Amino acid sequence: EYQVRDLPQALIWANEEAARKLLGQSPVPAYTNDIRMVMTPDLAVWKKIYQHQLDSYEDSPDLQTLSAHYKGLSENHLLQIIGHELAHWSDLFLDDFADYDANIWFEEGMVEYISRQYFLTEEEFAQERFCNQLLVDLFQEKHGWHSLDTFGKSTYEGDYASIFYEYWRSFLTIDQLVEKVGSVQALFETYHKWAQSDQSISLLNWFVQEELLEKEI
């Protein structure tokens, strides 16, 4: 359905330290490149990482809601993370692993959306969307707004709140677009329509110009 024809040559289960430092230099212990996929399959580790998004915010009812949500994550979320990484291998994306700064928000948002739809229950999907919006609002209230087009390799130089902020905005943007065009397949078709244009404006601005998005999140 999503044209995932090729798969990583290796799927490596690793503890948090190995996944983050020894194998990929990544602050998030799940990633894919053109050879392998690496992931820490420990739910407790992921609960801890997601909780770290909240470290710089003062206690509030919203923060308590978010903390309770992440403490209660099910093993479906581990499957969703695996699905997220495998969905990167879809041939429907136009860029390869070397082009990480080229409209990467779209690919990251799509693989997050697809994997959540596939592995999470309807209730879990809705709760993730709700919590993502809370986190985006908290981040923007504290740090201000910037365009999603800045999502790129430099994103990973920040703390967990700033890293996941870009992922959650990407997901929420894709969620709006899918609702507008009707399906994931229709959104891929729209994406390919932009690719066949002169690409004089970014994909994100093109969605706004085509009135598929009212404005950036």
Feature-to-residue mapping (PLM):
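A long, hydrophobic alpha-helical segment
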Residues: 70, 88-100
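A structural motif
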Residues: 79-86, 138-149
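Post-HExxH zinc-binding segment in Zn-dependent metallohydrolases
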Residues: 101-140
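Auxiliary, metal-adjacent structural segments of Zn-dependent hydrolase domains
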Residues: 1-60, 67-77
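Pan-zinc metallopeptidase signature
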Residues: 142-217
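Active-site recognition of the HExxH zinc-binding catalytic motif
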Residues: 80-93, 112, 116
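Surface-exposed patches in mature extracellular/periplasmic domains of secreted proteins
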Residues: 3-14, 102, 128-129, 187-190
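Hydrophobic (often cysteine-bearing) scaffold residues that line and stabilize catalytic clefts
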Residues: 75, 79, 83, 103, ...
